[in-house]
Amino acid sequence: MKEIIKNPLGHAIMLQVMGLVLLVAALLSFSILPAEAEDAASAEAQELVNKARLSFQSLLRDPNMTWFRDHLKDAKGVLIVPQLLKAAFFVGGSGGSGVLLARNEKTGEWSEPAFYTLGSGSFGLQFGAEASEVILLVMTPRGVEALLTSTLKLGGDASVAIGPVGGGVQGATANLSADILSFALSKGLFAGISLEGAVVAARDDWNNAYYGKAVRPLDILMNRSVSNSHSAELRATVGKAVDGK
C-alpha cells in the first residue's frame, strides 16, 4: 500500500482510468435512457389501444347505447377514451387519454390510431367522483379537420352534443347537426358528462413512440404513411361494428 502511495505517477494514471470508466458509463446511460423511455411510451400506447377496444365493445353491448349504434355507420371518425377521470366537490375537472381512428370515405377502411388527451375544467355545485368510458363520434368533415390540429376546443373549434349516457341515465337530446356526438358509460355520482369547452390535444410523444418516428395526426389519419400491426384488433372491431357484423 505504501509503495502505491509513493508512486504518484501510477496513482494519477489509475485515477484517470477510473475517470474514463465513469465517463463512458455516464455517456452510455444517457444514450440508453431515451430508448428506454420510448419503449415505455410505446408500451403505454399499446395498453391504451387494447383498453380502447374493450371500451368500444362495452358501449356496443350496452342496451342504453341505441343512438351510439345507430349513428356509428355515419361517423367520419371515432375517438375512444377508455378512462376519463372526473372528481369534484365544488370545482370539477376531468381528463384522460384516447385514440382516434378516421374512416376513408371511398374505401370505408379505418385508419391507424392517433393518440390524444382529453381534458376539461368546470365550476359548479358538483359532488362525487367517477371514471367514465367515453366515445366521441365525429360526424362531419369539419370535426375531423379540427382534430387534425395539435389542439382543439370542443364547442368552439367543433360543435359537440351529448348522446345517451349509460347506466340508465339519459343525456340531452342529441343535436344531429353537431360535428361531434359524445357517448359515455359511467358508474359515478354525476348524472352525465358534458364536454363543452373540453380541450383535445395530440399526444406527440405516444404517436412518435408507437410508430417509431416523428409523425403528425395528419400522417396517421389522412396520409396513412405509418402503420403498427398491433392495432389490427382495434381497427377490425370498429370496422365490423360499422358494417353491422
Task: Kindly give the residue locations of the regions a language model identified.
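N-terminal secretory signal peptides that target proteins for export/translocation
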Residues: 1-14
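Residue-level detector of alpha-helical hydrophobic segments embedded in or interacting with membranes
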Residues: 3, 28-29, 77
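N-terminal secretory/membrane targeting signals
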Residues: 11, 15-18, 193
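Bacterial N-terminal signal peptides
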Residues: 16-30
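Sec/Tat signal peptide C-region and signal peptidase I cleavage site
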Residues: 32-37
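Small-residue-enriched, tightly packed secondary-structure blocks
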Residues: 38-245
